[in-house]
A protein has these predicted regions:
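N-terminal membrane-targeting/anchoring modules of bacterial envelope and secretion proteins
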Residues: 1-117
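Generic serine detector
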Residues: 2-5, 37, 71, 114-117, ...
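Hydrophobic core of alpha-helical transmembrane segments in multi-pass integral membrane proteins
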Residues: 28-32, 51-61, 101-104, 148-161, ...
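Membrane interfacial helix motifs at helix-loop boundaries and amphipathic/re-entrant anchors
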Residues: 30-50, 106-148, 200-225
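Generic multipass alpha-helical transmembrane bundles of integral membrane proteins
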Residues: 64-181, 187-194
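C-terminal transmembrane-bundle signature of multipass membrane proteins
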Residues: 154-166, 175-252
């Protein structure tokens, strides 16, 4: 008996998906029950990254709880395993592009951010219009956007470690692909959730501008499309990790 066939018989699939659901439910509860800021408009910028971290924690917990219990009989495999052979490349590339967009938006927001009406730096957008100056917020400068960048960086490290564990583990190729897809899905939530929060918050501020003309229309269109795409991507990633069997059957 090979190590892969032994692991297949001891993988506790009955607990894997429920633990992932528990992580997502914890993320929803944290966002709904925890007041990250006394300013209601800022809640979105903190709650969405927190949700993504809870989802990733659920996937990590599921991997620890449901991982195979190896038998004392082990057979070495000659074929080398590589992480890229198990990762859904199209999804990973699409999510990497969104992570780059998130970084660009945060950099733009940080460079254009100003102090708010209370003199606190990096929390508002100051604009000079013919009718007068405007001070709009919240604007996702570094003060508000650090949870998005920090959560994405932390989740990227966790995803890389989990993918390595999955690749080196003794189990069938299909099981590795399912586990790797779930890890990428969790990372996708960590990317798309803050991307939606940042792009949506910026779009609301841009919509409130009383000037800017064509530049306003272009920026608003780009931010709206980004928020919409990130929302769809986030829902897809949740489906990948919360409904793995349905996704596998649809792909087969």
């Amino acid at each position: 008996m090979s190590a892969a066939s032994t692991a297949e018989g001891t993988w506790r699939t009955w607990i894997d998906t429920p633990v992932r659901w528990a992580g997502a439910a914890a993320g929803v509860a944290v966002g709904a029950l925890v007041d990250f800021s006394p300013e209601p408009d800022v809640q979105l910028l903190y709650a969405f990254p927190a949700f993504g971290l809870c989802v990733m924690a659920g996937v990590l917990a599921a991997d620890l709880v449901a991982r195979p219990r190896h038998s004392w009989i082990r057979v070495a495999e000659v074929t080398p395993r590589r992480v890229r052979d198990h990762v859904p490349r199209a999804l990973a590339a699409f999510l990497a592009a969104q992570a780059a967009i998130l970084t660009v938006l945060v950099v733009i927001a940080a460079r254009t951010a100003s102090a708010d009406s209370k003199g606190r730096p990096g929390r508002a957008l100051a604009v000079e219009c013919p009718a007068g100056s405007q001070l709009l917020g919240p604007w996702p400068g570094l003060y508000y956007a650090w949870p998005a960048l920090g959560g994405t960086a932390l989740g990227t490290v966790a995803c890389a470690l989990l993918l390595r564990r999955v690749t080196l583990r003794s189990q069938t190729h299909d099981q590795r692909r399912i586990q790797a897809r779930a890890a990428v899905g969790a990372w996708g939530v960590l990317v798309t959730a803050p991307l939606f929060a940042v792009s949506f918050t910026m779009a609301v501020v841009v919509l409130s501008l009383s000037c800017a003309g064509a530049a306003k229309v272009f920026a608003l269109t780009a931010l709206t499309l980004t928020a919409f795409t990130s929302a769809l991507s986030g829902c897809h990633c949740l489906g990948v990790l919360l409904l793995p069997q349905a996704y596998t059957e649809a792909r087969s």
